[in-house]
């Protein structure tokens, strides 16, 4: 397949650079170098034992944050290649998008956010930025990974602008304001928070949706939270299943699940490519900055696919995320986060020595953020082990 570069692609030779200037690293482009730094980071490795929906001990074949991120990167590269975008930047953003997630999935995040409300709250996007700009401490010349402007911009804005043209917070941040980590970093390295991100960042974001829905369908079926028959009335998944059963009558259930998920992913990818090409032809952006200035997303589903996607998400919410088997475990997982946070905040000597060094301060908000950083970086397994060591019980099984 012959490669081409879209007029609106991000060009590595035109990168706005890094906060701390560095010599180039041939033959890698700046974006390829970003991807490599993300892959070699401690935070990326820890994703192996962080939950998507199931706590890590539930089964070896269910997705974790790591397997999910790899799958998002595969989808994202496929779309980027078809659209003529920079594949390295797209992949870097896909691999980094979940770095800031807590143990125990969204349940852990909700509990940590609740506990941190008096101190500025918790936001996984802001935490991802903290990790790559501050918390990873591997290099002699700087904290963080010193990623390029384009990667940081995409990491922060992959779901759209954070503020309006007057600087007022938008969307999820309208009521609570922007997280301090984003405000502080943007003041040093302007991320243009009022504009959309690059097409590559938008591809990474929609690839997350594609992988999430398709693979949670797979995991939910394997876990027995719903069965193949339940998919029959769900647009997209039901259509894919009908095609599979018609093509291979008598196919066994496991193969039917795999073939159905394959078709869901393929159909969504094809739709994004076709719809984005249609928008690009109509809007005619001629550069990456032109994409940022469009005032609307360039990358997206068609109206029909967007509706099917919403229906599938609603189905998964009812059948899977709200299933008693899942919610019961998540409620107990939230207790782990709560117990650990309260214990560390009350007695900083419980923290490891390398996390204690900066903790002796009269600034309780700063100390709470230190505790938050420590807990947010935990894997499910480490959080459970710490809880058992400190409280001599395993709350997931009581």
Which residues does each predicted region cover?
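Short active-site segment of divalent metal-dependent hydrolases/proteases
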Residues: 96, 100-104, 211
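Alpha-helix boundary/capping segments in eukaryotic regulatory proteins
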Residues: 82-85, 100
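Hydrophobic alpha-helical membrane segments of integral membrane proteins
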Residues: 89-94
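Conserved short loop/turn motifs at secondary-structure junctions
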Residues: 95-96, 113
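A glycine- and small-aliphatic-rich helix-loop capping segment at beta-alpha/alpha-beta transitions
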Residues: 105-115
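Helix N-cap / loop-to-helix initiation motif
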Residues: 85-86, 105
